Amino acid sequence: MSETQRAFVKRITHETQVQIALALNGGPLEIGQSILGGAKTTVAHQASSSQVINVQTGVGFLDHMIHALAKHSGWSLIVECVGDLHIDDHHTTEDCGLALGQALREAIGQVRGVKRFGTGFAPLDEALSRAVVDLSNRPYAVVDLGLRREKIGDLSTEMIPHFLQSFAESARVTLHVDCLRGTNDHHRSESAFKAVAVALRDALTRTGTDDVPSTKGVLM
């Protein structure tokens, strides 16, 4: 694990500007200079002595999902994005996933002294999702949420698994997520993100040793 277990990532392309601050153990967190100007909201926002979360991507349902991921992972997290939403939600969603994955990878550093493998189940009313993660340095994602609607709020449902795939690719983790049951696509999606959070928290549980959990002797 990295010494600080914190990361700051800035990703700037011709399509989006994203900056992310992440603290795996929660606590106070801030970004020095916002890229949002005056266009700020407080919907996906909370602040306490143990956790600071502020997610502003310009896509409301994406904010909601990332907020749930951070909350149940125990992270403090600030996400700011200014993207080409006049085109569609693809670049914003993908780049936020890539930047968040990079931040997680940098905050973890070398994988040692942790379980490495994590499993999470999370219900939301009638929906139940399962996530399994391996901090493996082998980026791969299998995501099956069975979503039926074209959009949830202003987020295309096809971008929900794509966010998780982009996140896993950039974090260099293996991630399997599936929704086992559920009739409401909002519930299916949210239970999936919460399950991922539980799995990540499990994978990062300290073992009480400084060992690398691999026969290779190194991970990440």
UniProtKB/Swiss-Prot annotation:
One Gene Ontology molecular-function label: imidazoleglycerol-phosphate dehydratase activity
Swiss-Prot/TrEMBL keywords: Amino-acid biosynthesis, Histidine biosynthesis, Lyase
Gene3D superfamilies found in the cross-reference section: Imidazole glycerol phosphate dehydratase, domain 1
Reactions catalysed: D-erythro-1-(imidazol-4-yl)glycerol 3-phosphate = 3-(imidazol-4-yl)-2-oxopropyl phosphate + H2O
InterPro entries membership: IGPD_sf, ImidazoleglycerolP_deHydtase, ImidazoleglycerP_deHydtase_CS, Ribosomal_Su5_D2-typ_SF
GO terms of biological process kind: L-histidine biosynthetic process
Pathways per UniProt: Amino-acid biosynthesis; L-histidine biosynthesis; L-histidine from 5-phospho-alpha-D-ribose 1-diphosphate: step 6/9
Membership in a protein family: Belongs to the imidazoleglycerol-phosphate dehydratase family.
Protein's name in the database: Imidazoleglycerol-phosphate dehydratase
